Structure formats: structure tokens, C-alpha cells
């Protein structure tokens, strides 16, 4: 399960991964992190966090990592971009 802050980030990730199949959760706002934590607790060993590389994303990621200790933060793969969508847009060759 891969958790994203926004829908465009999830679509961008799917574009980057091509045919690889994943299950996704889109928060649509970091204010939904508490609800997401409760829903994700049964999946403890299978959670990747890919929230935004900004202050709100950092706070939400820390809170989720505290509540879901086996979750893995994968935001670094898209640094220094703010999020996956920005990463995709800045690396597209037309």
C-alpha cells in the first residue's frame, strides 16, 4: 500500500512505474492522516509513505511513522522535488 497526499501524486507515481501494480491511498489532505492511520494499522508490514516534501508533509509523515513503525518513508526518492507530480513534470522529455 502506498500512501499519497494528493491524487495527482498518485497518478504521477503510476505513470512513472508503468505496468507495476500497487494499491494506493490518497489522503487528499494531511488533515486525513488520523483516519488513514486507523485504516492502515492492519497492513503494518506493507506501507510506503510518499507524502509531500514540505512542512505539512513532514509533520504528517512523522505522525504516521510514529503510529505505523514498520511503514517506510519513500519521499527521498523524489527529492529535491516537492512531490511526485513535480518530480515527473521536471523530468519529462518531450
Question: What name fits each language-model region?
Answer:
Residues 1-5, 49:
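Conserved Lys-Pro-Asp/Glu-containing loop-to-beta segment of HAD-superfamily phosphomonoesterases
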Residues 5-8, 53:
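Helix N-cap/beta->alpha junction signal
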Residues 15-94:
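TOPRIM fold recognition
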Amino acid at each position: 500500500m502506498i500512501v499519497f497526499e494528493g491524487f495527482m501524486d498518485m497518478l504521477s507515481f503510476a505513470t512513472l512505474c508503468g505496468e507495476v501494480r500497487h494499491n494506493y491511498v490518497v489522503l487528499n489532505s494531511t488533515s486525513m492522516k488520523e483516519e488513514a492511520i486507523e485504516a492502515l494499522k492492519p497492513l503494518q508490514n506493507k506501507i510506503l509513505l510518499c507524502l509531500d516534501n514540505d512542512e505539512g508533509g513532514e509533520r504528517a509523515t512523522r505522525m504516521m511513522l510514529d503510529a505505523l513503525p514498520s511503514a517506510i518513508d519513500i519521499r527521498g526518492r523524489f527529492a529535491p522535488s516537492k512531490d511526485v507530480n513535480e518530480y515527473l513534470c521536471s523530468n519529462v522529455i518531450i
